[in-house]
């Protein structure tokens, strides 16, 4: 039976893979690079150590940032004057200017971009 640490590490790794799929959808080159880096980091820290829980927590935070804060822009590569289109998906964190004024506090935004 696997240890709780191993289960947590696998869960964090799967979270990163899911987050990269969402964040880098339609950008195969970046998707592959992000997944290779995640694999490299997990392989590098394969042996359990004192800082393993911190590394697992870091991986979960990376997955959260990828899922909620990374927005990719695309434009027609043939037209230099083409406008950038942002690929904003349902998981992207949306805020308003009032949230900037709330220093040091967590702001929960529960409205879609179109509201």
Curated annotation (Swiss-Prot):
Q: Does the keyword Chaperone apply?
A: yes
Location in the cell reads:
Mitochondrion matrix
Q: Which domain of life is it from?
A: Eukaryota
Q: Where's the transit peptide in this chain? A: 1-36
Q: Which UniProt keywords apply?
A: Chaperone, Mitochondrion, Transit peptide
The annotated region (Disordered) lies at 95-115
Task: State the Gene Ontology BP annotations.
Answer: mitochondrial respiratory chain complex III assembly
Q: Which GO cellular component does the record give, naming just one?
A: mitochondrial matrix
A GO molecular-function descriptor: protein folding chaperone
Is Transit peptide there in the keyword field?
yes
- State how it assembles: Interacts with RIP1.
* Family of this protein: Belongs to the complex I LYR family. MZM1 subfamily.
Query: What is the annotated role of this protein in its UniProt record?
Result: Assembly factor required for Rieske Fe-S protein RIP1 incorporation into the cytochrome b-c1 (CIII) complex. Functions as a chaperone, binding to this subunit within the mitochondrial matrix and stabilizing it prior to its translocation and insertion into the late CIII dimeric intermediate within the mitochondrial inner membrane. Modulates the mitochondrial matrix zinc pool.
Query: What name does the UniProt record give this protein?
Result: Mitochondrial zinc maintenance protein 1, mitochondrial
What species is given as this protein's source?
Neosartorya fischeri (strain ATCC 1020 / DSM 3700 / CBS 544.65 / FGSC A1164 / JCM 1740 / NRRL 181 / WB 181)
UniProt gene name: MZM1
């Amino acid at each position: 039976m696997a240890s709780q640490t191993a289960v947590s590490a696998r869960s964090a790794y799967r979270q990163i893979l899911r987050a990269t799929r969402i964040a880098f959808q339609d950008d195969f080159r970046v998707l592959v690079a992000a997944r290779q880096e995640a694999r490299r980091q997990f392989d590098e820290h394969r042996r359990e150590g004192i800082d393993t829980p911190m590394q697992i927590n870091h991986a979960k935070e990376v997955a959260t940032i990828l899922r909620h804060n990374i927005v990719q822009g695309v434009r027609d590569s043939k037209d230099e004057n083409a406008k950038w289109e942002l690929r904003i998906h349902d998981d992207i964190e949306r805020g308003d200017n009032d949230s900037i004024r709330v220093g040091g506090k967590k702001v929960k935004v529960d409205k879609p971009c179109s509201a």
